[in-house]
Amino acid sequence: GLLGLGYGGYSGYGGYGGYGHGLALAAAPAAIAAPAVVAAPAIAHAPAVAVAPAVAHAPAAVSTVSQVSYGTTHYAPAVAKVAAAPVAVAAPAIAAAPAIAAAPAVGLGYGQGLSLGYGHGLGYGHGLSLGYAAAAPALSLGYGGYGHGLSLGYGHH
């Protein structure tokens, strides 16, 4: 399983732990397979962030989580295992066209706006979002939009 704790993040993103400026602690396999990309219904007014920066300052088993969205296609996150040392992964935030979740059990985030779990669950970025991912049994609880708030996730992958 993957246990993630993060500060900030795409709330409502089922099972992949903290997002944005945050930290993901892995008690899980070194690599997690990304779900297959499938079509999803169109949802307007949901600008996506291309790459979510992850900053890790944690003990040995640390996974950094990145999420990439282009246009209306949402790619599942890549999870990479890193060594026990302060690690900083900084990528520029790129404004994208309105985008929606396109992978099973993947959430849609709009910074401080809407957060929608494509598997099961619905939330609001500035409030509380709770989602259950159908593709990989996972529970995600998050508060806040991109860059502030708290998100917590647990999943079996």
UniProtKB/Swiss-Prot annotation:
GO molecular function, one term: structural constituent of cuticle
Keywords for this protein: Cuticle, Repeat
Spans through the membrane: none
Sequence repeats: 27-30, 33-37, 39-42, 84-87, 90-93, 96-99, 102-105, 135-138
Top-rank taxon, per record: Eukaryota
Function: Component of the cuticle of migratory locust which contains more than 100 different structural proteins.
Domain notes: The tetrapeptide (A-A-P-[AV]) repeats found throughout the protein are also present in many proteins constituting the protective envelope of other species.
Protein name, as recorded: Cuticle protein 63
Organism annotation: Locusta migratoria
